[in-house]
From Swiss-Prot:
Record protein name field: Bifunctional peptidase and arginyl-hydroxylase JMJD5
Keywords from the named record: Aminopeptidase, Biological rhythms, Cell cycle, Chromatin regulator, Chromosome, Dioxygenase, Hydrolase, Iron, Metal-binding, Nucleus, Oxidoreductase, Protease, Transcription, Transcription regulation
Region ranges (Disordered): 152-173
One MF annotation (Gene Ontology) recorded for this entry: p53 binding
SMART domains listed in its UniProt record: JmjC (SM00558)
Co-factor(s): Fe(2+)
Binding site for a protein: 236, 273, 316
Family annotation (PANTHER family): BIFUNCTIONAL PEPTIDASE AND ARGINYL-HYDROXYLASE JMJD5, HYPOXIA-INDUCIBLE FACTOR 1 ALPHA INHIBITOR-RELATED
Residue spans crossing the bilayer: none
Any one Gene Ontology BP term: protein destabilization
Positions contributing to 2-oxoglutarate binding: 270, 316, 319, 325, 334, 398, 412
Length: 414
C-alpha cells in the first residue's frame, strides 16, 4: 500500500451517504433471490448478515459477512473454476458487498477505504453480478473518495522510468523481412477489409483506427496509477504460461508497477488477458470498439475486451484463439509472428487437452532436432507500434513478445 493511504480521509460522512444511496431503503426491498443450490444454513446466515446491516449493527454484520466469505470461498475453490456454480459466486459477491459497506461505515483513514476497495474488487473478480452490478457502482464511489495519489511524473512526452525493462534494447528487436511482413493499410473501407482480409482470413495491420482514442494521448504509467493504482487485479508470474513455475497472484496495480516495472524483479510479471475495462469503467472511456467489429455475427455486448500490460520481455507463447482478434497497441512495441492454421502440424501443438491450442516450440529459439518441420513453415511478422491495430484471424497461430514497457488492448469477436 502506498504511503498516501495513511492520510486522513476527506468527508467520511459523504462517502457513507453516497454508498448508502446505492442500496434499497429497507431490508424487504433487497432481494437475495438465491436458488436451492445454496445451502439453507448459508442462505440463513446471509439473511442474518443483511438484517444486521439494516439494524445498524456494523460489527456484528462485519463478522457475519466474513463468515459468509469464508464458506463461499471454499465453494469457489473446490474443483475446476468452470464447474463452480454461479449461485455460489453470487453469495460471495453479497459477502463482499456487506463487508465493504461495514468497513466504510465510519472510516477514519483512507487505508480503511483502500481495504474496502480491495474487498469490492475481490467480489468483481471472483463473484457474479448482483443487484444491477452494484459492486461496480460501489467501486466507483470508493475510488472517487480516495485521496489522489502522488506518483512520480511519467507522461507520454517524458522519459519512461530508467530501468532495464523500460529501455529500448536494439539487440532484442528482431529483423522483420520485407516479404514476410504483415501488410499495412490505413483505415480501409469496411467492405474492402471484409473481402480481402476477414473472409479469406488474412492478417493485416490497420493504421489510424485508434488515432482518435483518448488513451493514445492520456495513458502513461502515472495516468494508469492515478486511475487504477489502488485496484486489485490478477497478475501472471513467470516467463510463459507453459512453464512449470508459472503462477497467478492478486495484487494492486500500484504493487504490480512497483514490483515488476519500476524494479528489477527476479520473475516476469504480466497483467495479461484481463477484462480490466469491465472492472474499471473509467479506463473504458478512453478506448472504442473498432468499427470493423460490426462485420461480425455477434452483438457488441458479446465482444470480449482484454488488457495486456507489462514490462519489456513478456511473452505469449505461439498459440491460437477461436475468435477473430483486433490487437491495438497503446504503449510500447511488440514483436509478433503469425502462422496460418494450415501450418498447425508444423508448429507442433501440445498433445494435452488443456494446452492443445499452444505450440511446443520456442519460436525464437526452436529445437529443430525435436521440431524439424518448424523451420519450413512460412510465417508473417511485424513490430506493432503505438496506434497500430493488428487483425489476427480466428485460429491463426500467433507469438507475442513485448520489446518495451507495453499496454495492448485486444477485442475478441465472432
Amino acid at each position: 500500500m502506498s504511503e498516501d493511504t495513511t492520510e486522513p480521509l476527506v468527508g467520511p460522512s459523504t462517502l457513507w451517504k453516497d454508498l448508502r444511496a446505492l442500496l434499497p431503503d429497507t431490508e424487504e426491498e433487497l432481494k437475495l433471490d438465491l436458488s436451492e443450490k445454496v445451502d439453507r444454513s448459508m442462505a440463513t446466515l446471509l439473511r442474518q448478515a443483511l438484517g444486521l446491516f439494516y439494524e445498524g449493527r456494523w460489527q456484528k454484520c462485519l463478522q457475519a459477512s466474513e463468515a459468509v466469505l469464508d464458506y463461499s470461498w471454499e465453494k469457489l475453490n473446490t474443483g475446476p473454476w468452470r464447474d463452480v456454480d454461479k449461485e455460489w459466486r453470487r453469495v460471495y459477491s453479497f459477502g463482499c458487498l456487506l463487508k465493504t459497506l461495514c468497513l466504510c461505515q465510519a472510516p477514519q483513514k483512507a487505508t480503511a477505504v483502500a481495504e474496502a476497495l480491495r474487498v469490492c474488487d475481490m467480489g468483481l473478480l471472483m463473484g457474479a453480478a448482483i443487484l444491477g452490478d452494484i459492486l461496480l457502482k460501489v467501486a466507483t464511489v470508493l475510488q472517487t473518495h480516495l485521496l489522489p495519489r502522488k506518483q512520480p511524473a511519467c507522461g507520454p512526452h517524458q522519459d519512461q522510468p530508467a530501468t532495464k525493462k523500460a529501455k529500448h534494447d536494439a539487440s532484442s528487436t528482431p529483423d522483420v523481412v520485407l516479404d514476410r511482413e504483415v501488410p499495412r493499410l490505413r483505415c480501409p473501407p469496411l467492405q474492402h477489409f471484409k473481402k480481402h482480409f476477414l473472409v479469406p482470413g488474412r492478417p493485416v495491420i490497420l493504421e489510424g483506427v485508434a488515432d482518435h482514442w483518448p488513451c493514445m494521448k492520456k495513458w502513461s504509467l502515472q495516468y494508469i496509477q492515478e486511475i487504477a493504482g489502488c485496484r486489485t487485479v490478477p497478475v501472471e508470474v513467470g516467463s510463459r504460461y507453459t512453464d512449470e513455475d508459472w503462477s497467478q497472484t492478486l495484487m494492486t496495480v500500484n504493487e504490480f508497477i512497483h514490483k515488476y516495472i519500476l524494479s528489477e524483479a527476479k520473475d516476469v510479471g504480466y497483467l495479461a488477458q484481463h477484462q480490466l475495462f469491465d472492472q474499471i469503467p473509467e479506463l473504458k472511456q478512453d478506448i472504442s470498439i473498432p468499427d470493423y467489429c460490426c462485420l461480425g455475427n455477434g452483438e457488441e455486448e458479446e465482444i470480449t475486451i482484454n488488457a495486456w500490460f507489462g514490462p519489456q520481455g513478456t511473452i505469449s507463447p505461439l498459440h491460437q484463439d477461436p475468435q477473430q482478434n483486433f490487437l491495438v497497441q497503446v504503449l510500447g512495441r511488440k514483436y509478433i509472428r503469425l502462422y496460418s492454421p494450415q501450418e498447425s502440424e508444423a508448429v507442433y501443438p501440445h498433445e494435452t487437452h488443456i494446452l492443445h491450442n499452444t505450440s511446443q516450440v520456442d519460436v525464437e529459439n526452436p529445437d529443430l532436432e525435436k521440431f524439424p518441420k518448424f523451420t519450413e513453415a512460412p510465417f508473417l511478422s511485424c513490430i506493432l507500434s503505438p496506434g497500430d491495430t493488428l487483425f489476427i484471424p480466428a485460429k491463426y497461430w500467433h507469438y507475442v513478445r513485448s520489446l518495451d514497457l507495453s499496454f495492448s488492448v485486444s477485442f475478441w469477436w465472432s
